[in-house]
């Protein structure tokens, strides 16, 4: 093989990786799955090309078939890779999650940003009769959750606009529009705490703060029934900020200046 052939081979390999990444991003934006035709339309590739890439991703469990109904969604290997990459942060933060959950008697979670969504890395579920229960690994729109808002607020403006995309999801009657969200993110940068009041799910409220660690940015969030939120909001915000301080002291911050 001469130098020209080698360069062509490298370029082809890079193109395949880029196409696979675009397909996975499309599936990540549609957690319930997409048909081959829908994927091809979204990424602007021939259906036959999408089929070949999907087959390769499926062999690595990065994509999985939905069953007899057809279509594909992101596979379990992606979550496993994320969890493996986050092993250090999980073990370091776990004791603080437990402590915060016990102090407030509410569900607590640790999350990271994945595109326009948050990925729940770990959680402690409250033992109360009326509580909010959610699984590890769940992906939810960042713009409609407190955990997502603190992570979005940490992004530079150009990156933020790209992360928000052209159209924000409308999940409830309380979901914020772009203008209101951008204004709220500016306030979050000042206060250090974000909230969502029935914006993701009716009856569910959350509060969150940003963890600025040498391992990257994460969000620490309290998720609770809305019926308890108004009376406890000040207490929750104070507890979150204290927990943030404790965690960043123990782990080490990535920057000296808050984003």
Swiss-Prot record:
Coiled-coil annotated spans: none
GO molecular function: DNA binding; DNA-binding transcription factor activity
One Gene Ontology biological process: negative regulation of DNA-templated transcription
DNA-binding region per UniProt: 36-59
Transmembrane residue ranges: none
Record-annotated IclR-ED domain positions: 89-253
Induction cue: The ttgVW operon is induced by toluene and styrene, but not by the antibiotics carbenicillin, chloramphenicol, nalidixic acid, tetracycline or gentamicin.
Keyword line: DNA-binding, Plasmid, Repressor, Transcription, Transcription regulation
Domain HTH iclR-type: 14-76
One Pfam family this sequence matches: IclR_C
Alphabetized InterPro entries for the sequence: GAF-like_dom_sf (IPR029016), HTH_MetabolicPath_Reg (IPR050707), Tscrpt_reg_IclR_C (IPR014757), Tscrpt_reg_IclR_N (IPR005471), WH-like_DNA-bd_sf (IPR036388), WH_DNA-bd_sf (IPR036390)
UniProt entry tagged with the keyword Transcription: yes
PANTHER family noted in UniProt: HELIX-TURN-HELIX TRANSCRIPTIONAL REGULATOR, ICLR FAMILY, HTH-TYPE TRANSCRIPTIONAL REGULATOR RV1719
Function: Represses the expression of the ttgGHI and ttgVW operons. Binds to the ttgGHI / ttgVW intergenic region, probably preventing binding of RNA polymerase; ttgV dissociates from this region in the presence of 1-hexanol.
Protein name: HTH-type transcriptional regulator TtgV
């Amino acid at each position: 093989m001469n130098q020209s052939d080698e360069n062509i081979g490298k370029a082809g390999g890079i193109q395949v990786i880029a196409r696979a990444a675009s397909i996975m991003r499309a599936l990540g934006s549609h957690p319930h799955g997409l048909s081959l035709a829908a994927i091809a339309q979204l990424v602007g590739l021939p259906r036959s090309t999408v089929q070949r890439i999907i087959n390769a991703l499926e062999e690595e469990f990065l994509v999985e078939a939905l069953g007899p109904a057809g279509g594909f969604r992101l596979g379990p290997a992606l979550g496993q890779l994320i969890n493996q990459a986050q092993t250090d942060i999980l073990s370091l933060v776990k004791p603080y999650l437990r402590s915060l959950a016990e102090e407030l008697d509410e569900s607590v979670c640790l999350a990271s940003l994945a595109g326009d969504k948050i990925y729940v890395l770990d959680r402690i579920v409250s033992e109360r009769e009326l509580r909010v229960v959610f699984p590890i690994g769940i992906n939810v729109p960042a713009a409609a959750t407190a955990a997502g808002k603190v992570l979005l607020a940490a992004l530079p403006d150009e990156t933020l606009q790209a992360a928000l995309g052209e159209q924000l999801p409308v999940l409830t009657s309380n979901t914020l529009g772009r203008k209101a969200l951008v204004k709220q993110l500016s306030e979050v940068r000042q206060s250090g705490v974000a909230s969502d009041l029935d914006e993701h799910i009716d009856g569910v409220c959350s509060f969150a703060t940003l963890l600025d660690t040498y391992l990257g940015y994460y969000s620490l969030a309290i998720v609770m029934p809305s019926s308890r939120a108004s009376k406890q909001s000040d207490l929750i915000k104070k507890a979150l900020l204290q927990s943030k301080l404790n965690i960043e002291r123990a782990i080490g911050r990535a920057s000296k200046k808050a984003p």
